[in-house]
Amino acid sequence: MYQTDKKYLLQKVERQDIPLDSPDTTLYVIGNGFDMAHGVPSSYDRFRDSISKRNPLRFTLENFIKKDDIWGNFEDSLAYLDREKMMDSLDEVLDVMGVLEEDDDEFSAADFFGATENVSTPVYLLTQELPDYFRKWINKLKPSGEGRPLQGFLKPDARYINFNYTEFLETLYGIPMERILYIHGDRRDKKCKLVLGHGHDTEEVFREWHQSNKDREKFQPRRKGRRGRYYNNDNPTYLAYFLKDDSKGNWKSQMRYDAINHTVELIEDYYEESAKKTTEVLVRNQSYFASLSSIKQVVVIGHSLSEVDDPYFREIIKSHGKTPDMEWYISWYSPDDLRRIDRFMKRMGLDKKQVKLFRV
């Protein structure tokens, strides 16, 4: 027994003691820990190492994503593009590219849009280049050996939801493809876009960012200049996100006003683009989840149980209808896993009697 806190005692069992006599009522949920247990170098740290330090994509990830350790929780980190850093580069780009006022005879729309696109290069890299790099990396993954530590434990007649993009359930254990739902995509399907992204409510992320920055001196309506005189704030981030009345903004010019607002559109489009479309995935697989009504036990192997995937687990529970009757067997590796499982149980409303832990 392992005590996670004073309220929870989570029972540990040996893998061979898990009753798997009725595979037709058993659902396996497979996460990245499954691949890693088979020697697949599929951690996000390995993905980072596959990208050259000089690559603009890696520079963008490590400099324009405002997280201390983006690789520790990579998909979650994608929700934290640094708005301020992107907006602060706008004036320099407009100046370097020599963008003229819109009423100037030599004004070039191409120069204007070229400048704003230059500022939004991080957005392009994250929405266009990142999925391509990620897929190429995924396509190269393979087990390091022929070991099959779960031989006999994985039942071919059971149901499987695979959160990985790889087919090792099939190739290593002979699980029929038709028994597996590749919930985030199958790397062998070239027409299928792999699901990658954060699961945050983008409006909530914005509110938190706005709330934590609104009182900073940099984002106040009046600022003190070098000579001690006050002036109306002309900072692009302030004008874009904190100014309450556009008509009172120190935009300096119509061209700059348009450039700031166009850049904001590109940045905010990123947040929607980078979100994991969980609802769409659920709708697309509605009939599959409806077919899980007979499932009585769920075996979770190598899944982080992060909140981004909560909707899928709630759908599993919903399909069963009788939450207290469902048994859960969840693999764990470290004390951090135990804490995550504890939080997951509380979010899902699972009783400690329903959940047992085992090691892979």
Where are these predicted regions, by residue range?
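Alpha-helix-centered segments that form part of catalytic cores
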Residues: N139-K140, E146, E265-Q286
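Extended, H/D-rich, highly charged conserved domains that either
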Residues: T60-E265
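Short N-terminal helix/helix-N-cap motif within the alpha/beta-hydrolase-1
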Residues: H38-G39, E170
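Short secondary-structure boundary/capping segments
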Residues: P41-I51, I175-R179, E315-I316, M345-K346
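Phosphate/oxyanion-binding active-site loops and adjacent basic polyanion-contact surfaces
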Residues: V40, F47, L57, L130, ...
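Extended charged low-complexity segments that act as oligomerization/scaffolding linkers
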Residues: T25, S43-R83, E273, G349-V360
